[in-house]
């Protein structure tokens, strides 16, 4: 026979697998899961346990009921009892010796044996003789709980308890004559303990199956169940929670049944609280007043007389009413649950409509409020009217959810439409303005794009001032010209200082800002470098100036940087005053200078033009007053005004990193007033003004328009030429600077082009170009910028300059390590390396070059780049020889006997063989001999023997030409 699994047996018995597993564990059979297999004997025992009706015997003649049996009203007289009932009394008597033997071993085990003998039946003795305790479960099937209302006690519980009391009483009477008889109090306590405490595992295996798995069978009597009281109590509590009305009805019926039974009972005491009660309309088994055994005469008659009979129709009616009420309660619960779901859904819809109503722009209210009576009708008609599709206002970018709210559509519709358009998007994904416009057009909406207000753009846009608040301001004058034409010397003469003597090489390499006073009016001078490397500085000076002074040496005339300065001034649209300097020199010719200026569009006033020309001598201080008068005249004609009562705005002229003071910026205030404590922004740097110094080094607390000052307090060194603006607070400054830095990073990432397959060969070719890596450190930002531009102009197609890093301040150890890693040199301009940097440079063998004059640095870099250039190769012919005789040797090969026609033939030279004007071979000499001696060279007019490497096909009359290749170094132009 095939072994059955637990779940197959459960399906066959129509019960749960878990219940079978629990029952098998109680019987002492270990089962792990529902897939475990069972032996045939175990399956048969479970069949007998859960289907005892299959082993029923045929009914015999009616007999008196045995102890422990329950007699239903409809089965008392008319039906015949099974033959197994006949043996109950005999079995009780036959088991008395066993009980006595067990009682000698222990009182508690005696009580258990008594109860086990009482519950034994004759139904399964023949089938399972090996486990007698299980036989009491096979006696007869139990009645299903479906036949009674939920929560009501069973009708046979009281009878079962009374039968147990009868058995105990019978046992005590049988033991009355023994020495080890137990008091009645101890026996009662033991009965209560057996009813309340949990059974040991052996007795747990004998517990009956659940009552709800089998249909009720009227032909079989119910057997007692010791643990049903607790389960029935739980069912009663559950029934009370489900329906109070049904519970009250059941309680009334239960109490009425108890009263009827108490009146009908003879010789029994009333039911106490805590004991198992009877089912409404059920039976109470009564304990006979007389001590009659089941086999005694008159026992059955007394039993039937004391058992009241309740009509079955009354029980069925009460059961039907209770079941209907339970069904009504379940139906009400389902209705309440569905109503709750509907209310929650309506609430969510109302909240969504309220949110859309708040986002929707409200139309203007027209007319009076007297038309309020017609509002409900208008609202009822609103859904029928088509919605007016107003233009959707969008910003720079929007999410799908925001666009759906504005269009009164669900996000799913928009996502579906985007998928149709080939765009995969989520509900929170941002889409650009173009995509949003196309998507809105698909639904018939127009789009208006309104970009958000850019705070940075508003700050950079200079507002218009009220003409009443404008005041006169000093003019800003920029001195421009060629190098060594005397710009700084002229300013020294005006300021009565000696700045030129303190500058390296006698040339200006920074923008200097000064302020002088003449005739009670202030003039601000900006001194720009004249060297060609400082083009950016000159252009920056021309942008911030009001008047440009073009200094031209009378002996040199117009030079390249002079022309560049003229172009900067014209581009900035500022008036130009020409100062012809060095008129005291012997070779001075001012007229020639004026003639040259006319070639560039500057015509002197005395020649009918509008350009003011002043002859000055900075060395002898001649013509300075005339120059200042002309400056004030042009400024007065220009009507220079500014508003000092507003936040300051200006330009960063120069910036540097001071070791003791940190980032320092020379700024020119162009409008407003700059105060100590103001928060300002300059490019990617921001800060609070901690201190200000004027051009003479004095601390000041405020600086008005056209005032050059030195500002301390920046977070980092700003770029020269940046516009600085005073803002309200530091928080706003940080926000704007963060945006600028993020924008700068994005631009750098965009500028980094990706290498494609088509450009791969191009990049390979570029890899063959030699590079000279340079790290620039200078004292001011302007010098770094000038050096960078000057060195980058030296790059050619074969060698180029790679500026790895440029910064302001002293040379540090970090710069040295960067140069070592990138194989670069360090150029320091007006700065020195610290101690650690010098030691690191020696250890890493990094070349550090220090300069104070910019053109010295440019010349050295040019020489270094020239050394990287590939040299040019040139061929030099040494001599020619004619082959007149051929000598053949087995070891060497053919030897040419030659006569040197011109020049000389050297042994290490390269040769080529020419036959009839055609080169037939080019190679090296293997040997050169004169007679039998090896020689280094043979000059013109002598004979020699020549052997060629790897070439023997020589002929008489061939010409051997000797030559060498020379390498010629190249220079950068």
Curated annotation (Swiss-Prot):
Region annotated G3, chain positions: 527-530
Record key words, sorted: Cytoplasm, GTP-binding, Initiation factor, Nucleotide-binding, Protein biosynthesis
GO cellular component: cytosol
Region annotated G2, chain positions: 506-510
Residue ranges, annotated region (G1): 481-488
Main location: cytoplasm
Positions of region (G5): 617-619
Composition skew (Low complexity), residue ranges: 374-386
Annotated segments matching region G4: 581-584
InterPro entries assigned to the protein according to its UniProt record, in alphabetical order: EF-G-like_DII, IF2_II, IF2_N, P-loop_NTPase, Small_GTP-bd, T_Tr_GTP-bd_dom, TF_IF2_bacterial-like, TIF_IF2
Residue ranges occupied by any tr-type G domain in the UniProt entry: 472-641
Lineage: Bacteria, Bacillati, Bacillota, Clostridia, Eubacteriales
Family recorded in the similarity comment: Belongs to the TRAFAC class translation factor GTPase superfamily. Classic translation factor GTPase family. IF-2 subfamily.
Pfam families linked: EF-G_D2 (PF22042), GTP_EFTU (PF00009), IF-2 (PF11987), IF2_N (PF04760)
Residues bound to GTP: 481-488, 527-531, 581-584
Transmembrane listed as a keyword: no
GO molecular function: GTP binding; GTPase activity; translation initiation factor activity
Function: One of the essential components for the initiation of protein synthesis. Protects formylmethionyl-tRNA from spontaneous hydrolysis and promotes its binding to the 30S ribosomal subunits. Also involved in the hydrolysis of GTP during the formation of the 70S ribosomal complex.
Stretches with biased composition (Basic and acidic residues): 83-120, 128-148, 157-172, 186-202, 210-246, 272-288, 314-333, 343-360
SUPFAM superfamilies: Initiation factor IF2/eIF5b, domain 3, P-loop containing nucleoside triphosphate hydrolases, Translation proteins
Location(s) in or outside the cell: Cytoplasm
Keyword Kinase attributed: no
Region: Disordered, residue numbers: 52-388
Organism: Pelotomaculum thermopropionicum (strain DSM 13744 / JCM 10971 / SI)
Name of the protein this chain belongs to: Translation initiation factor IF-2
